[in-house]
Regions:
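Phosphate/NTP-binding elements of NTP-utilizing enzymes
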Residues: 2-204
């Protein structure tokens, strides 16, 4: 199996974006705008005065974190989680852009709208657990929904992921952090579609 690199992931994201704009992949107007905004943000990085930089390795970090977990239900149960192009596109936006001033992430709030049966809870659980454990920026993570039952779906998904995988993850992460060279770029580090809002709040 080919080793997945940061370059390969960004090429996947770029190809996905081009398919959205060409019409090869059907998408609503708002999603097309999101793709256009991503292209615009990337192009702006060429300007020396741009206050942001892009770290593809940070996107790879999240991808590798997701791969350490396995599907817990459905026909893929037991298989490692492989981010779809759409979810990789979200990750590339959320985790790739940083501020030159202090190395903090550019985007602090994320709005994700996705139809039912697209593993929303699983994806949000991956993001939430990623914010708590391996990132250099530690956060408190709050999960809110229209009802306690709805928000509990994400919470239970997090528990399911961790209880099934935590031992291996702790060992792998400890080894990885011990041997990984420091990165110079970062200075700190219902039938209808359901709407989720995530806010990452810096822990005191």
């Amino acid at each position: 199996m080919q080793e997945v690199t940061a370059e390969i992931l960004i090429e996947r994201v770029w190809a996905y974006c081009e398919k959205i704009l060409s019409g090869e992949i059907k998408a609503c107007q708002k999603h097309k705008w999101a793709v256009q905004r991503f292209f615009k943000d990337v192009e702006a990085l060429a300007d020396p005065e741009c206050p942001f930089y892009y770290d593809a390795e940070a996107v790879l970090d999240f991808y590798e974190w997701a791969r350490q977990f396995r599907h817990v239900e459905g026909i893929l149960a037991g298989e490692p989680i492989e981010l779809t192009d759409f979810k990789l596109f979200i990750a590339a936006n959320v985790y790739g852009f940083f501020k030159k001033e202090n190395g903090a992430r550019r985007f602090r709030k994320v709005y994700i709208q996705l139809a039912r049966k697209n593993a929303k809870s699983q994806f949000l659980a991956l993001m939430a657990s990623y914010e708590v454990f391996p990132t250099t920026e530690k956060h408190r993570v709050f999960i809110a929904g229209w009802s306690r039952e709805q928000s509990d779906e994400v919470y239970q998904a997090i528990l399911e992921q961790l209880l099934r995988n935590i031992s291996a993850i702790v060992v792998d992460q400890a080894s990885d952090l011990q041997h990984r060279p420091q990165k110079k770029a970062r200075k700190s580090r219902r039938e209808k579609s359901t709407h989720y809002r995530l806010e990452f709040t810096k822990a005191q």
